[in-house]
């Protein structure tokens, strides 16, 4: 009885014991219905870790995580897929093509994210560049995740890809026990990326990577 009331009796201990700060569930049993809502609720520039638990389901969302959302643990309960179908040549709301970056299903702009057990998909098909995940932040760690697409599935942007750019510091991203698939250049960008115990599968007879190594990297 007393153990069950510890979080109530000692608020600081309650925060330590709490398994997640936000729960996302499509059936309404959580704090939010969508990941977009949960990301928006993360405090800006927070030094403490925010935990988001995503319950089983397919979430049809295009998510842009800004640089202000940092130090987040995002993990799944059951099979979770985040999917969208934009592609670079698609006309956006401005009347212009979305471009490669604009085609991303999920954009990670913040630092220090740890992501466990989610599947990220760009379902546009073989229509040219269509990014599933774009990473601009540093200190990102993906564990047991799946990245599905065709051309340009995983965009590890890093410091950028401008001609002649010299960098002294660049984004570092780690992948453990992950699965990545695509057709052409489906892992690309200028970030420093480590893939450990990952399966990388080409679904076409083409190039797997298109690295962009800046001077000074």
Where are these regions (language model features)?
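Sequence-level preference for short, compositionally simple segments enriched
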Residues: 1-217
